[in-house]
C-alpha cells in the first residue's frame, strides 16, 4: 500500500518543480514556505523564556552525572509504595499448601448416615471406606501403588463402582440436555 501511494505522490508532482526549489536561494525558499517569515519566527520564539531554556538545560546536564542518577533511583524506590499489582505478584510466588498441611485444617468428619448414603448410592454397601489408603499416603507427595497393597481387589472393586456411578450420572445428564435442545 505504501509503495502505491508513494508512487502516486511522485507521479502527481512534476520533477521540474523540485529542481526549481533546489536551485533557488534559501531566502526565496523561505518566502515560498507558509509561516516562514520573520514575523512567524518571532511569534514562535516569543513563546519561550530564557529561564525555561536554562532550567531545561540544567536538568539534562544533571541527569548525566552518576551521583545524581544514584540519588534519583534511591528516591524513586523510596517513593514507590506497594501497589495493587505488586501484591498480586507476591501472591503468585507463594506455593499453595495442601489442606492437610495447613494450620487449623481438619478433614470433614462423616457421620454414620453420610457413610450409609454414600454406600447405597454406589450400590456397593459391603466395602469399608478408604481410610486405610488415606493413612498410608498421609504426608507423602508420591503416588501410592494400589497393586502392592494387601487388599488390591477391594480397591479395584471400589473404583469400578465409582466409575460406573460417574458414567451413569454423566449419561443421564447428557440425555437431559439433548432433549432440551430439540
Swiss-Prot record:
Pfam families: TDRP
Key words of the record: Cytoplasm, Nucleus, Phosphoprotein
Region described as Disordered: 1-71, 117-152
Gene Ontology CC annotations of this record: cytoplasm; cytosol; nucleus
UniProt keyword annotation of Nucleus present: yes
Chain intervals with Basic and acidic residues compositional bias: 49-58
Tree of life domain: Eukaryota
Comp. bias regions, Low complexity: 22-37
Tissue: Predominantly expressed in testis.
Gene Ontology biological-process annotations: spermatogenesis
Phosphoserine modifications at: 7
Annotated TM spans: none
UniProt feature, compositional bias: Polar residues: 59-68
Subcellular location: Nucleus; Cytoplasm
Family listed: Belongs to the TDRP family.
Oligomeric form and interacting partners: Interacts with PRM2.
Task performed by this protein: Contributes to normal sperm motility, but not essential for male fertility.
Name of this protein: Testis development-related protein
Organism: Rattus norvegicus (Rat)
